[in-house]
Amino acid sequence: MALDQAKKAEIIAKYARGENDTGSTEVQVALLTERIKYLTDHLKTNKKDHSSRLGLLKLVGQRRRLMRYLKNTDLERWHTIKDALGIRN
């Protein structure tokens, strides 16, 4: 797994909407983005790791669905998280 507990807690603290918030859309997108970055680096060195490539595609699709939900519900939060994480769409 790419994220240890300290890194995960740091991301949750940064993007949480409240004190005990661990599951808001922003937090989920931020955690998925970190996992996607890790897998992207992994696949640069391990080009034949096809199972990780499929896992990466699954994570990207999940993040895309969450971003679409956020865009439909709160456009301002969508712009904020998109700019903060450097996501294109």
Swiss-Prot record:
Name the GO cellular-component terms.
Answer: cytosolic small ribosomal subunit
Annotated InterPro entries? Ribosomal_uS15 (IPR000589), Ribosomal_uS15_bac-type (IPR005290), uS15_NS1_RNA-bd_sf (IPR009068)
What are the GO BP annotations of this UniProt entry? translation
Q: Which UniProt keywords apply?
A: Ribonucleoprotein, Ribosomal protein, RNA-binding, rRNA-binding
Check the record and name the SMART domains matching this protein.
Answer: Ribosomal_S15
What are the protein's GO molecular function terms? rRNA binding; structural constituent of ribosome
Q: What does this protein do?
A: One of the primary rRNA binding proteins, it binds directly to 16S rRNA where it helps nucleate assembly of the platform of the 30S subunit by binding and bridging several RNA helices of the 16S rRNA. Forms an intersubunit bridge (bridge B4) with the 23S rRNA of the 50S subunit in the ribosome.
**HAMAP family named among the record's database cross-references:** Ribosomal_uS15_B
Annotated family: Belongs to the universal ribosomal protein uS15 family.
The subunit structure is:
Part of the 30S ribosomal subunit. Forms a bridge to the 50S subunit in the 70S ribosome, contacting the 23S rRNA.
Name it. Answer: Small ribosomal subunit protein uS15
Give the source species. Sulfurovum sp. (strain NBC37-1)
Gene that specifies this protein: rpsO
